[in-house]
Amino acid sequence: MLGARERHVAALRWWEGDRLVGVALVEDTVAESRALERHVEARSPLFRAMSRVVHGRDGVLKFPVRVVGHVLGSGDAAYRFVPEISAEAAAEAVDRAVRRGPAGPSGRRPGVVLVKDFPLAAEAGAVGGSAVWRRGWFGLEFDPVMRVPVGAEWSGFSDYLGALKTKARTKVNRIAVCSEGCEFLELSLDEVQERAVALHSLYLEVYSGAAFRLGGLHAEDLVRMKSAWGEQFRVISIRHDGEEVGFLCGFLGEEGIEAFMVGFRPGFQRELALYQRMLIEFIRWGVESGSPWVNLGRTALDIKSSVGALPFRMAMAVRFRNPLLHVLARWAARLSRPRPVELKQAWRSEVLASVLGQAPETGGLRTRPCRLRRPCPRFHRGLNAHRVRLRTCRTATSA
């Protein structure tokens, strides 16, 4: 990422003598808000009125922002310090460095600084506008991060299927029927270099419909990450009838699988259930690699919960360089909260107890049983359709 020509990114490092004790990733980018009401619920008519004003007639709000953390990822990855450096000392060091940071590409420092993300306890109250990180900053919370737990004793994908409730397992099988004609082909570095522009165009098909954007993926990013991470960064091309209709990519890290980016042609989504199948492939990769978790990110909460993802609250710390704007933004944050969602519960209760050690904490998020909606037109064709299980062709990756 540091070498990407399209990105304005830098690494911060802290030393004690000759010893490296801390690192952080900082990137200057542009945030773009569209249809904010899809993710944030206003608790005041005044907040709704202000939101309409700042978004203008076009309903779009753009502003430069300096981000401490990965602009394209979700999770606690803003900075890292050695264990003997206390959390308070680490936060103070990052705060001081960001405040004194250099000017951006325009010759000026962005007026907004964002540090992301921080885990929140499920039972924590509203954090919008409060000092969740340090004084002089205020918290902001959007949708939770959705993660799928993987049992330590699971030896194959069938163990995942067996851990689901009947209706959820039926849905996974229905996804398999819908996408039965798809090939999932893992790309080598040379193939990623050759296909980078085409893959990026598929990504833009999805990115263009996002309600909130923080930076974006560049075609060059795929090549650089594949070159740097090798087999731990997988890029999967999805073909249907010989045509490339989508792709997915992700990381294998110490803490689990990180679903990174996907792209697909919208016209194929409903017929082939491409997005749902991508989620299943990430979960398969997690099971087969022995990872404890599969991080599926923040979007499409309902769909992800239907295949076993659980919500984990995350907050960001925000600071405006302009004191007046900072006060107004903090006040607005206090009048908003993440929009409540009704999530499905896909797991058998005894499985959750054995995998997590306790019942999952939903932090006020309502749950409901998994119900099948809009069945795939292929699902009821043939007497043996209900017996189809997820599988890949001989040329496909096992992820």
Task: Say what each PLM segment does.
Residues 1-43, 114-270:
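A conserved beta-strand-loop-helix scaffold within acyl/acetyltransferase catalytic domains
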Residues 29, 76, 132-164, 240, ...:
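Active-site/acyl-donor-binding loops of N-acyltransferases
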Residues 31-138, 256-316:
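Acyl-donor binding region in acyl/amide transferases
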Residues 38-70, 321-355, 371:
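Alpha-helical membrane-targeting segments
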Residues 390-398:
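Short, intrinsically disordered C-terminal tails of secreted or membrane-associated proteins
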